[in-house]
């Protein structure tokens, strides 16, 4: 196993802090913000979907391995619950996809934008999509009662479930 590393918090925003160059040069610094970590000049194209209409495009900033990318929200269409008990007992959901196949998604919560803590870890799942939102980006959200898409500030941290590029 690798060595554990801690993440330093930086609540300061400036012309330098929060840029792509700054984050690449300082991977162990987490930028706290009440807003999007890209601030007013955010770049919605970093994960390949600047207009919200592009599907499954790989970019150099995409955190997925070669041959995979951050999915657009259409990848989650056709998902249905197996059961509420499934989520409550297994810290995740076994989704039925398009009526036949199943796939397990853990409930990992998300790292809150304004605090150094994981919120809702036991019973909610948050998976980033490549779709930009008005104040952040969209994520696929699920718990023991529903599933949907909603926006989350980019200063928050959520899971990424990579999809194979076809």
Regions found by a protein language model. Give the residues of each.
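C-terminal, surface-exposed recognition/capping segments
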Residues: 5-12, 26, 31-166
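Aromatic-Pro/Gly-enriched surface loop or interdomain linker
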Residues: 1-21
């Amino acid at each position: 196993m690798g060595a554990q590393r801690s993440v330093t918090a930086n609540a300061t925003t400036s012309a330098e802090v929060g840029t792509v160059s700054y984050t690449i040069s300082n991977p162990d610094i987490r930028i706290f913000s009440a807003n999007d970590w890209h601030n007013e000049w955010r770049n919605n194209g970093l994960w390949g979907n600047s207009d919200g209409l592009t599907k499954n495009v790989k970019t150099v900033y995409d955190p997925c391995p070669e041959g995979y990318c951050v999915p657009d929200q259409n990848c989650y269409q056709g998902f249905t619950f197996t059961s509420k008990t499934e989520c409550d007992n297994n810290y995740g959901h076994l989704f039925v996809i398009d009526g036949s196949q199943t796939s397990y998604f853990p409930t990992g919560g998300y790292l809150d934008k304004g605090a150094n803590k994981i919120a809702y870890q036991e019973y909610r799942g948050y998976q980033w999509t490549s779709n930009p939102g008005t104040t952040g980006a969209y994520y696929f959200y699920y718990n023991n009662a529903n599933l949907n898409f909603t926006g989350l500030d980019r200063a928050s941290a959520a899971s990424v479930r990579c999809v194979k590029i076809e």
